[in-house]
Amino acid sequence: MDKEILNADFDTHPETVDTEEELSNYLSEIAEEIGWIVIYFNSLEDQIAQCLREMMLRDAYQDERLDVFLAEMGYQVKARALVHLYGQAIAFGASRLPTQDLIDLEKALTEAAAIRNGYAHADWIGLRTEAYIKVKTRSTRNGVMHRYKRIDPEVAQMDVDFISSLRHRLEAVHELVLNQIYGQPSTKNETDVQN
């Protein structure tokens, strides 16, 4: 469960934990999942780059000049470019991937970035009671807002599983699209694409 609280509403912010021992125990319990989130997210980003190479070139290793551009692109730009390339293939009839599957994939890729950023930029040392962590601070016309997310080992494991499974889903979609473009039978089935 997330909570968004105005900075000025001090009384409504979750209380910080009482002891260093409590903080240390919590961090020890969740550190492995944080690491897996970073590892799987980085792998997902690499997979997106590989898919871009394959969508743009006949031989992904033929022209390393593309890597000059990919190295300068952030995750969101790479993900959006890949989704647009898939959309172009659909629009021109080269792929029969259902538009809703593409929309769902785009949303999932965006959600993966939000999850990863929440973990990467969270105030882990500022742990609050009931496992609330400040994951985002933003400025609005109403003042500064802090977003807290309850992250216990179970939630963290669900986030690990989501990002890990998204990479497999992307591989399935990519194989399906490429096989449709080049007229080859796919080894992936529709359930792989949707999950």
Regions found by a protein language model. Give the residues of each.
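Acidic, Ser/Thr/Gly/Pro-rich intrinsically disordered interaction regions
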Residues: D2-I39, Q50-Q76, R80-N195
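N-terminal signal-anchor transmembrane alpha helix
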Residues: E45-A49
